[in-house]
Amino acid sequence: MIVRRNKKIMIENSLYDKKSLRAITGKTADFPEVAKDCVAFANAQGGKIEFGIEDGDTLPPVSQVIDEKLPVDLVNKIAGLTNNVVINLSFAVFCTNNS
């Protein structure tokens, strides 16, 4: 982790990855690739994937909205593509002041 101007910037590594929301939604969804990353984390020390954050960004886009069904659908799809991979979901809500 790097701290710049009082902001923590997570560096992608063997324990942490950021993925665009496009990786798990719409025609660009690539669940086999996401499942592969989950298996890699499970085979190591575990890890964290934050969805909805674009490469080079530290927060999701301000206008981004996530369908409330998406997290459960994601877990079900990953479970269907893997064996013995435990997924723990957590959610974060980011609020900004646009004024």
Where are these regions (language model features)?
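Conserved N-terminal catalytic/coupling substructures associated with nucleotide/phosphate chemistry
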Residues: 1-99
